[in-house]
């Protein structure tokens, strides 16, 4: 995302906040504190994350210092946040404003907090990264290990119960619904978590376990248990999951179609890929 595009997103957010404050005076001070008083998206994000994740052990001012330090060192995190906002705005029919993810959606908040934790992890500040991971888990019910690698243009829809393991990879333009697990298969160490390629959509409650690849543009049905690699541009569903067809689009994450189009298999218990 270019500087100009980032500025457009931020300007849209502030314009919405002004309109919202005029329409609902009871929330005018809220919109001012969270959006209107800030000069840029990074400032608003640091304020929001600090206040969401503060605790008696680490007050908001201390968390905000950490967030601002991370953003100063790696401004691309702010651009990634803007891409995530655009992803939610364009994919979630319940979201009609750019400001909504920033103000209200815990999936977005958890993802931005993960980005800070990931930066801390890579800086060798792993104790603080794990502390932040715990705060995110307690506050948002989303557990993303700070060592996981996640791209931009990500939507964590509803988000409650999402788990992403230490060696998981999520590429750009992926949509993940609530209660999804990207987990391991046991207690062995090493590279043990799924690799989710660009454009994938993972339905609610799906469990993808082990060091397996879900190929570009694949779709995972809600409630599925995926134990084997999923080829690109296929639809997998069931317990255990098997290939049941192909998505209608190149990137199922963009259209969020939950139907299984072109099903070519009738499920029986125990079928698998």
Swiss-Prot record:
It comes from the Bacteria. The keyword ATP-binding does not apply. It is found in: Cytoplasm. SUPFAM superfamilies: Trimeric LpxA-like enzymes. It catalyses: L-serine + acetyl-CoA = O-acetyl-L-serine + CoA. One of its GO terms (biological process) is cysteine biosynthetic process from serine. Pathway: Amino-acid biosynthesis; L-cysteine biosynthesis; L-cysteine from L-serine: step 1/2. Its EC number is 2.3.1.30. GO terms for cellular component: cysteine synthase complex; cytosol. Sensitive to feedback inhibition by L-cysteine. Keywords: Acyltransferase, Amino-acid biosynthesis, Cysteine biosynthesis, Cytoplasm, Repeat, Transferase. One of its GO terms (molecular function) is serine O-acetyltransferase activity. PANTHER family: SERINE ACETYLTRANSFERASE. Homohexamer; dimer of a homotrimer. Forms a cysteine synthase complex with 2 copies of CysK. Belongs to the transferase hexapeptide repeat family. This is Serine acetyltransferase.
